[in-house]
Amino acid sequence: MKGFIDDANYSVGLLDEGTNLGNVIDNYVYEHTLTGKNAFFVGDLGKIVKKHSQWQNVVAQIKPFYMVKCNSTPAVLEILAALGTGFACSTKNEMALVQELGVSPENIIYTSPCKQASQIKYAAKVGVNIMTCDNEVELKKIARNHPNAKVLLHIATEDNIGGEDGNMKFGTTLKNCRHLLECAKELDVQIIGVKFHISSACKEYQVYVHALSDARCVFDMAGEFGFTMNMLDIGGGFTGTEIQLEEVNHVISPLLDIYFPEGSGIQIISEPGSYYVSSAFTLAVNIIAKKVVENDKLSSGVEKNGSDEPAFVYYMNDGVYGSFASKLSEDLNTVPEVHKKYKEDEPLFTSSLWGPSCDELDQIVESCLLPELSVGDWLIFDNMGADSLHGPSAFSDTQRPAIYFMMSLSDWYEMQDAGITSDAMMKNFFFAPSCIQLSQEDNFSTEA
C-alpha cells in the first residue's frame, strides 16, 4: 500500500469489512516503531469517492475543477480524473501531471494570478486555453503569448477573512472590469466568463449574494462589447462538510436560477480543493524529544489544571518545513489523538507541540491538554490531506513521509457502480491481508 508524494507506482490495499482505518494505523505504527519511527500518512481513497458522490447529490449543477496544488499525489489525481472532475492548475508542472493522465485540455483551467510568460506559452502549446486574469498587465501578457486564450475575469469579493484588505489581494473591482473589457477588445483577447473566490473561513454567506450579483453585472457589461460569455467560476472555499455544502447551495441555488438560469448556455464551475482531500489523509508523527517546563511558561490557550503541575513541550519528527507547512500561513486548530491507550482517569497536562527544526516558527500546537507522553510515542493528526503532502523543505533533512493508500471493499464497489474503470488506476489495487490486530496487552517498546 506504500507510495510517496510524487510516486506514480503507488499501490492501494483493499480492506475487508472487518478492518478499519484505526487497524491500518496500528499496523504501520507497529512497523515504523520497529524500523525507524519515520512519520507517515494513511490515505483513504474511498473518502474521495464519497466526497464526489456528496457533491453530485448536493450541487450537481456545478462542475468541480479540482485545485491541484492542494494535493497533487498521483493517486488523488487519478481517482479524480476517473470520477470526471476538471482540474484547476497553477503551474506548468500541474498541467503536465493531469495531462499525463489523459485529461482533455478542455477540462483544465490555468488559474495562477501571476503567470510566467513561458508557462502561458506552454499552456498554448498543449491546448489549455481557459485561464483567469484580474489586471491589464496580465491581459497584455496573455495576448502576447496565447492567441487562443479564453479568459475568465477574476473579480474581487467582500470576503474580508484574513485581514482588513481581505480578498482584494487578487481580483479586480467591478468598476475596473469595464476598462479590462475595453483592453481585451483592443488586444483581441476573448473574454468568456467570470471567476470569484470566497474563503472557506467566511461564514457570511451573504457574500455570495453580492458576488453573484457582481458577476451578472460583468456578464451584461461584456455583452455590450460583443463578448460571448459562457462560464461562471465560483472558486473554492468548501470545507468538506455536507452541512457547509448544503448551506452554500441554499444561498446560491436560487440566485443561479435568477442570474444564470439553466438553458442560458452558461456553465457553472467551482474549484474545490481541501473539500475532496482533507479528510482522506491522516498523519502519524513520532515524539523525538521532550522537555518539562513550568506551567506558566506556556501560553494560556487552555485551562490550567493547577499552578504546581508541570507542563510539557514535545518535539515531533515532522513540522512546518514538512507536512505542517500550511501552519505558516494559517492557524491549525487541531488537537492530535494519542495513539497509545491510556486510562480515562489519567491526568492531563498543558502541552505544546513543536516540529524538529528548533525554529521559533516551527510550533504546531501552541497549547493543548494531553496525558504525559514519552519519547517514541505516536500522535495522530486527522484531516491532513490538504496542503500537507509536499516534498521536505531544504531547511529540513528529515525523510519525507511514506503514504499508505487504502480503500474499503464497500467503497471499491461504490466506485465500480459509479462506472470508474480506468485501467491505469485499477492496476494499482490489490487485496490487502488483514492488518495486525494489537490488543491492549501488546505493549511493545516505543523508547528511542
Swiss-Prot record:
Q: Which domain of life is it from?
A: Eukaryota
Q: Where is this site: Not modified?
A: 69
According to its UniProt entry, what is the function of this protein? Antizyme inhibitor (AZI) protein that positively regulates ornithine decarboxylase (ODC) activity and polyamine uptake. AZI is an enzymatically inactive ODC homolog that counteracts the negative effect of ODC antizymes (AZs) OAZ1, OAZ2 and OAZ3 on ODC activity by competing with ODC for antizyme-binding. Inhibits antizyme-dependent ODC degradation and releases ODC monomers from their inactive complex with antizymes, leading to formation of the catalytically active ODC homodimer and restoring polyamine production.
Native species: Rattus norvegicus
Tissue expression notes: Expressed in various tissues including liver, heart and kidney.
Q: Name one GO cellular component term.
A: centrosome
Task: Output the InterPro entries linked to this UniProt entry.
Answer: Ala_racemase/Decarboxylase_C (IPR009006), Azin1 (IPR031178), De-COase2_C (IPR022643), De-COase2_CS (IPR022657), De-COase2_N (IPR022644), Orn/DAP/Arg_de-COase (IPR000183), Orn_de-COase (IPR002433), PLP-binding_barrel (IPR029066)
Q: How is it modified after translation?
A: Ubiquitinated, leading to its proteasomal degradation; a process that is reduced in presence of antizyme OAZ1.
The entry's localization annotation reads: Nucleus
Q: Gene of origin? A: Azin1
Say which family it is in: Belongs to the Orn/Lys/Arg decarboxylase class-II family. ODC antizyme inhibitor subfamily.
Subunit note: Monomer. Interacts with OAZ1 and OAZ3; this interaction disrupts the interaction between the antizyme and ODC1.
Q: Which GO terms label this protein's molecular function in UniProt?
A: ornithine decarboxylase activator activity; ornithine decarboxylase activity
Name of the protein described by the UniProt record: Antizyme inhibitor 1
**Keywords, ordered alphabetically:** Nucleus, Polyamine biosynthesis, Ubl conjugation
What is one GO biological process annotated to this record? negative regulation of protein catabolic process
